[in-house]
Design a protein with these regions (language model features):
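Glycine-rich phosphate/pyrophosphate-handling loop used in enzymes and phosphotransfer proteins
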Residues: 1-130
């Protein structure tokens, strides 16, 4: 069940989702073509200036409201799992944050979101791979 306290229904409904997890050759996957071998790539949402998703991410990053990141991850994790996207995935690897930024902020927002995705799936989060 979604946490209405963290993300209201209106914000939840208007999150500008990419649905890239439903397209094999999506724009995120294409970014990696010729650079490295990957099996799958996707992105949860478009990040537009003035959008509510931007406000939510900023609350996570700059106000330290980690529960928002976990909740966003959980929402995306449910979409990934129900679509079958996670079927052949072994683990979730969050993008590392520069050590100085992590010291200042006290956490890596990518790891928080990854843990939310993991909470909606059976995938482990591996933070020491990259």
């Amino acid at each position: 069940m979604r946490n209405e306290y963290l993300i209201c229904t209106e914000c939840y409904v208007i999150i500008p989702r990419t649905n890239y997890h439903l397209e094999e050759n999506n724009p995120v996957a294409q970014l990696f073509w010729g650079r490295c071998v990957i099996e799958k790539a996707a992105a949860f949402s478009y990040f537009n200036k003035g959008s509510r998703i931007r406000n939510l991410i900023h609350c996570l990053k700059y106000k330290g409201i980690k529960e928002i990141g976990f909740e966003l991850g959980k929402i995306y994790g449910l979409s990934l799992t129900s679509s079958g996207f996670t079927r052949d995935i072994d683990m979730i690897i969050p993008v590392p944050l520069h050590p100085s930024k992590e010291r200042i902020r006290g956490f890596n927002q990518s790891e928080i979101i990854s843990r939310g995705i993991a909470g909606a799936s059976t995938l482990p989060v591996e933070i020491n791979t990259l």
